[in-house]
C-alpha cells in the first residue's frame, strides 16, 4: 500500500478550519484530534465541528478520540461524518464491541495505544480493526518531539500484522516530520499523521506530497515490505 499522509488539524488555524482543510486536499485523510480534558490534559473540538468539516472538505475525516467513555461517544462521530474513528485501548470498556459498532455504522474502526501501552495483549483483537495507531508522543498536545523508543513497538506490530495475514493499516502519530518519517516507514508504519510538518510549511499541499514521497521510498527499501 502506498503511504498515506493525514495532516492533523490540531496544528491548523482553528479560525480558518474550512480553508485549512482545503489547503491539504491532496492528502489521504484529514486527522481530527478530539480531546475532552479528562483522558488527556487538553480540550479541542467535538461533534459539531466534525459535522462542519465533513461538509467543508472532500477529504475523508480520520477522527482520533482522546476521550473517556469512547464506547458512548464514538458512534456519534461516525454519524457526524467521520470515515475512520480511533478510540484508545486505555479508555474503551469493550473494544471489540465498539470496533464492530463503528464498522456497522459504515466507518473504519481503529484503536490507539499510548506510548507505555504494549501491543501484545491486543494481538487477538487486531482482526476486529481496520487500523492500529501507535502514539509516538504522549497524547494531548501537538508539536512534541518524536519518541525513537517507539520504533521497536512499530516493528513488533508490523510483525503481528504479517503473522496473522491482516490487511490492517498501521498509523503513527506524534513528531512525524521529514526528519522522522523514513524511520517510521522502515519500522512498518504506512499511515502517517503530520501536524506542524504540514501546517507549519509555506505550502502545506507540497509538504504532504514530499512526506508521501519520502515514506514511499523508505517503504520500498524496508525489509517488512519485500514480500508484499
Curated annotation (Swiss-Prot):
Pathway: Carbohydrate degradation. A divalent metal cation binds at residues 31, 33, 64, 173. Keywords: Carbohydrate metabolism, Isomerase, Metal-binding. Transmembrane segments: none annotated. GO terms for cellular component: cytosol. GO terms for biological process: carbohydrate metabolic process; pentose catabolic process; pentose-phosphate shunt, non-oxidative branch. The keyword Metal-binding applies. It catalyses: D-ribulose 5-phosphate = D-xylulose 5-phosphate. Substrate binds at residues 8, 64, 140-143, 173-175, 195-196. Its cofactor is a divalent metal cation. InterPro entries: Aldolase_TIM (IPR013785), Ribul_P_3_epim (IPR026019), Ribul_P_3_epim-like (IPR000056), RibuloseP-bd_barrel (IPR011060). Binds 1 divalent metal cation per subunit. It comes from the Bacteria. Its EC number is 5.1.3.1. One of its GO terms (molecular function) is metal ion binding. It holds the Pfam family Ribul_P_3_epim. The active site is at 33 (proton acceptor), 173 (proton donor). Belongs to the ribulose-phosphate 3-epimerase family. Catalyzes the reversible epimerization of D-ribulose 5-phosphate to D-xylulose 5-phosphate. This is Ribulose-phosphate 3-epimerase. It comes from Streptomyces coelicolor (strain ATCC BAA-471 / A3(2) / M145).
Amino acid at each position: 500500500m502506498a503511504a498515506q499522509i493525514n495532516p492533523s488539524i490540531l496544528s491548523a488555524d482553528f479560525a480558518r478550519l474550512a480553508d485549512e482543510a482545503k489547503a491539504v486536499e491532496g492528502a489521504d485523510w484529514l486527522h481530527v484530534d478530539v480531546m475532552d480534558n479528562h483522558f488527556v490534559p487538553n480540550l479541542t473540538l467535538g461533534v459539531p465541528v466534525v459535522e462542519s468539516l465533513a461538509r467543508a472538505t472532500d477529504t475523508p475525516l480520520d477522527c482520533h478520540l482522546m476521550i473517556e467513555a469512547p464506547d458512548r461517544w464514538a458512534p456519534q462521530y461516525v454519524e457526524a461524518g467521520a470515515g475512520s474513528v480511533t478510540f484508545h485501548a486505555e479508555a474503551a470498556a469493550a473494544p471489540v464491541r465498539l470496533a464492530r459498532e463503528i464498522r456497522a455504522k459504515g466507518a473504519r474502526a481503529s484503536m490507539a495505544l499510548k506510548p507505555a501501552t504494549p501491543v501484545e495483549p491486543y494481538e487477538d483483537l487486531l482482526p476486529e480493526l481496520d487500523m492500529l495507531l501507535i502514539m509516538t508522543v504522549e497524547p494531548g498536545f501537538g508539536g512534541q518531539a518524536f519518541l525513537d523508543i517507539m520504533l521497536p513497538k512499530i516493528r513488533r506490530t508490523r510483525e503481528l500484522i504479517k503473522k496473522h495475514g491482516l490487511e490492517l493499516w498501521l498509523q503513527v502519530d506524534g513528531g512525524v516530520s521529514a526528519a522522522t518519517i523514513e524511520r517510521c516507514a522502515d519500522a512498518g508504519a504506512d499511515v502517517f499523521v503530520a501536524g506542524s510538518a504540514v501546517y507549519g510549511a509555506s505550502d502545506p499541499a507540497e509538504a504532504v506530497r514530499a512526506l508521501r514521497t519520502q515514506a514511499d521510498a523508505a517503504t520500498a527499501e524496508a525489509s517488512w515490505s519485500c514480500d508484499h
